[in-house]
Amino acid sequence: AALLDMKWHALSKDEAAAIDTPEKVSAYETKSLKDLGLEIDLVPPRYRTTYFNHIFSGPSGYSAGYYSYLWTQMLDRDSRAWFLQNGGLTRANGDHYRDTVLSRGGTMDYGEMYRNFANRDPDVKYMLIALGLADESIDDAPRIAGQPEDRGE
C-alpha cells in the first residue's frame, strides 16, 4: 500500500487528473504494481487505492477523525521521547504524568495538559522517526524503543 501510495504522489497534477474513472484507477494501480515487481496473482494486494476513499472524500467527517489518529500517534511518540530524556519509566516520571495529564481528565485543554507534562509543545519528529520518514540524527533525537529494528524487522 505504501509503495502504491508513493506512486500516486509522484504523479503531476495533470497526470493524476487524467486518471478520472474507476477503470483508469484500476489500470494505473495494476501498471504501478507491475512496475514495482509486486503484481503477483497468488498474493493480491491487501489494500487497494480506493480502500481509503472514505477518509478523504464526502461529508462524513472521517478525515478529521483520521487526523486525530495521527495526532494521537504523534503524542504517543513524543511522550515516549520525553520519558527517555527524563530517566525512563521511573516512579517520579509516572507520578508527574498522572498529576499533569491523567488526573486532569476533561477539565483542561489537552494542549495545555501536554505542555504542563512535557514543559514544551509536542514535536512531530519522533513520529516521523518511528514511521521511517526521518532518521534519528535529526536534532539528536533519543532512541525510541519499539521502532522496527527493536522488533527484529
Locations of the language-model features?
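C-terminal, non-catalytic "cap/extension" segments appended to globular domains
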Residues: 1-153
